[in-house]
Amino acid sequence: MSAYDVAPSFLRNSKRPISSISTTTRPAQPSSISVRPIPLIGDIEKGDDLFTREDFKLKPDFVNRPLWVCGDGRIFFEAGLFPEIANPVGEFLVAIAEPLCRPKHVHQYQITVFSLYAAISLGMSSEEILETLFKFSKNELDPKLTDYIRTHGSRIGKLRLVLRRRRYFIESPVESLIKTVEQFYKIHPHKLTPIEKDDESGIYSFEIDPNAVEKVKEAAYRDLQMPLLEEYEFKGDSDLPTIEMALRPTTKLRPYQEKSLHKMFSGKRARSALIVLPCGAGKSLTGITAACTMRCRTMVLTTTAVAVDQWKRQFEMFVAMDPNDVITLTADHKQPLPEDRPCILISTYSMFAHSIEHMSRSSAAVMQQVRELEWGLLIVDEVQVMPAKTFRQVATIVRAHCKLGLTATLVREDDLIEDLQYLIGPKLYEANWQELEEKGYIAKVQCVEVWCEMTLPFWSAYLNTSSGFIQRSLYTANPRKLTACEYLVRLHEQRGDKIIVFCDNISLLKDMARRTKKPFICGSVSMQERMAIIRCFQHSNRINTIYLSQVGDNAIDIPNANVVIQISSHYGSRRQEAQRLGRILRPKSYRDEDGFNAYFYSLVSRDTPEKEYAERRQRFLVDQGYAFTIISDFDARIDSRIADGEVFEYMDETVARSLLRQCLEGSDEIENETADVRVADSHTAVSDEQAERIIAQFSGGPAPAASGRVVSVSSLTGGSAGFYR
């Protein structure tokens, strides 16, 4: 079989022999779940082969067992060879270890003190973990590993952080443990009361300074390696009033959502936790169901004003409750909290980024209410944002009994992602993307990396400049890469697909949109214009391609989009790569002859840093089981099209010279759009006339008959009642 047979089927249908196009598939390679190295159990010498060491003893029936368990805590799971037990074994491993890499056949996990923290918080004991590992392991367990699990397992779960009437206490049934914590030099200065014993329960406790909660949790977690569990007996708490709310009868949870919530709740207790679900897999409904289960005062923290509006509308859609009990707090909407009843408050990270002294009077008044109240549940959307210095203080500003962190991409490019283990809690559930894809809960995506040669003028200029800024402009604006984009857009539009083209270079984004007569959205585009463009893309078959800058990375949900083409990006950001793929992960009802129904293209210039950035960006997706097909000779296909008379904008010499001049003049207009990442405003509506104008402008003709309805952002961000049926 030719290597080209792994490329999308519609790319294989060509006049050129398939043998003349070179492709390969980038294999899955295990990588760390964060930049900070995971603390291994013991040290492995460089070049040490785990499977030839003398202490690596195989059992006689090892061929019938699925796991290789190494002395340093690494576990290799032969999932492809044991499909009949893949699900229960996989669930066990996710509970006790960090998933490092889960391609189709062999999965890799790592046991750490922090994964044991998660396992024991779920009610598992050290002996249960060891017994199950021994049962499935091909080899005898290393004594070093068993001692490690027993030692840490005996301490984890014995220490709790409890919020009681706005005061924080550390509790433990073991006197020696709580004395160790109380006497630790980083914790002792923040102690407010001596250790006391409750004679009825036998629990020892002492109070700590509420302003030092983060420092105390960090010291217990990092230095003592004895994480403080945060659990809340919400059903027995008479101090917090309840909200009359319940899921509507038409709201149905998917099995993996139920599974994740089952791990968060145990009887009357709710555990603070992280839940990781892919984009488009229903993170919001998972959080809403948690709030309905607890029925207490709840805060939802998210990234943008649009996301605030989306959460509000989803509460109204999925939950039977008084709509007046759902309050929003944004820069443009500051509604005081009701004093006579509990509520659901939805706000943004940025609202908590400043001290009260620097807020407006109305903002300060609401924020003071937030600080003074005791919250039952804090839901943190896009939780990977929280460890940032600007936002992490919200974890202590909001005094919540229970915290739930939600994300699709538990990755950052700094060392801070691990801090979520003590800021929020352990990761109790992480969905397997490939499993959800196979069951149809998310789209089946084919990922393709297209290598493009630099044109001679651009390559010469690239070699003759020492400016990294100009070099980046040149390989980003490589005419052959832009021509490949133009070709792919034409190809997919002919197939009836809906295409998003991402480009972080704003001047290039505008130039491409203008020359190809497609609409674009970036930070300078008005809210009214953004809404009109998105509406037309959603509801008209005359607008099938839109160009987006990084404003489209978050808070945009276009369920019918099924193709992403990436021209430029933010260096090696794994998070951005996953978020952009997430734009096309909503489930689709159709598939091509190879079984795919969505396509993700990353276009890169050969022999430039762009190739290295692309490989770095793909690591998170590769760890989730995605394989990137690499087409290394795509330029030949373009040349054959040109020879047949097809015209491409950026292969015109005049256009290419103009683009080269812009790059050399340093007009790489990469705007800082972090302050304006809204794709649409929740209070903005679009008229039929505006939609017709957009369609006429970019389709070359009058618009088809409009629907006659005014569209709000909820319908444009996935807020449709049939979505979770």
Which residues make up each language-model segment?
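Extended alpha-helical interface modules used as scaffolds for assembling large macromolecular complexes
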Residues: 2-199
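Conserved helicase ATPase core of P-loop NTP-dependent helicases/translocases
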Residues: 334-337, 498-502, 507-511, 517-553
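Conserved SF2 helicase motif VI
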Residues: 410, 571-600, 617-618
